[in-house]
């Protein structure tokens, strides 16, 4: 028997990837596409490549007969929309940032709004499947992680958990394809602006910083602060992070490889690459995999960690489906058994 799901925000890039994955999921039926601006429009008119003959509607959510609702909506939207009564009717996976951070003050500082739903904020489960699998299985509200945060946390988590690095020395240099900026028309995202150009943005102010720090602090069991700098690169999709940290002791590469293997050997979507094989975005494109590898610089006593994901899949829609699979006791990789087409 298939579960019935709905999507708010299916017109965006992450929303469209969600539709694409769910259409091929054997245990899911897409029953509702919600929109306030495209009511009556057929989804195929918006995305002719997508075989979904379903029109957008604008119903009161309390009227919907769904098992699960995905929210691929702008920040602040779901924080105002969700309530306990709705969560008694259906499960929710929120792809926005509205329920990712536990401290309400972080929303005022980083997102510039006062969170209106602080009780639900505390009850939401952070949907990074490889770290919080058991909590996700029991959750009614899952906050799907951000794209940069997914790649950064997964790449560094074992090092923080084992406390083998100087936490105050961590620097993350991240690069993302343009789809990470969303589908809305913006001058800075036009072809002539991004083609043959790489630029940094959000210096010391990117909104994913507190999310990364929060969950690596949980791993370290102490408050940590790190440096995170993102860059926009002229490709459609993909994230590559290069992270640097000082080692606390004289460790060899095999020592660190043993640590990563300890944490990730049983995970279906994390691939610890062989020695000397460095992650590339094309190897994870359109897949739910996270590729990770590292090198130890014996001269500087630093570990250099590389991680790669597809920002729209493992960084958004694929991870949302992975969360759904856990919440409904499906195989974790159901509907996600695809890999990069080189």
UniProtKB/Swiss-Prot annotation:
GO molecular function per UniProt: N-acetyl-gamma-glutamyl-phosphate reductase activity; NAD binding; NADP+ binding
Pathway(s) of this molecule: Amino-acid biosynthesis; L-arginine biosynthesis; N(2)-acetyl-L-ornithine from L-glutamate: step 3/4
One Pfam short name: Semialdhyde_dh
EC number: 1.2.1.38
Keyword check for NADP: yes
Stored CDD domains: AGPR_1_C, AGPR_1_N
GO BP terms in the entry: L-arginine biosynthetic process
Positions in coiled-coil regions: none
InterPro entries: AGPR_AS (IPR023013), AGPR_type-1 (IPR000706), NAD(P)-bd_dom_sf (IPR036291), NAGSA_dehydrogenase (IPR050085), Semialdehyde_DH_NAD-bd (IPR000534)
Catalytic residues (positions): 147
Compartment annotation: Cytoplasm
GO CC terms: cytoplasm
SS bond list: none
The keyword Endoplasmic reticulum is annotated on this UniProt entry: no
Keywords carried by this UniProt record: Amino-acid biosynthesis, Arginine biosynthesis, Cytoplasm, NADP, Oxidoreductase
Catalytic activity: N-acetyl-L-glutamate 5-semialdehyde + phosphate + NADP(+) = N-acetyl-L-glutamyl 5-phosphate + NADPH + H(+)
Family the UniProt entry places it in: Belongs to the NAGSA dehydrogenase family. Type 1 subfamily.
Biological role stated in the UniProt entry: Catalyzes the NADPH-dependent reduction of N-acetyl-5-glutamyl phosphate to yield N-acetyl-L-glutamate 5-semialdehyde.
Alphabetical list of HAMAP family matching this protein: ArgC_type1
Stated name of the protein: N-acetyl-gamma-glutamyl-phosphate reductase
Organism listed in the record: Campylobacter jejuni subsp. jejuni serotype O:6 (strain 81116 / NCTC 11828)
Taxonomic lineage: Bacteria, Pseudomonadati, Campylobacterota, Epsilonproteobacteria, Campylobacterales
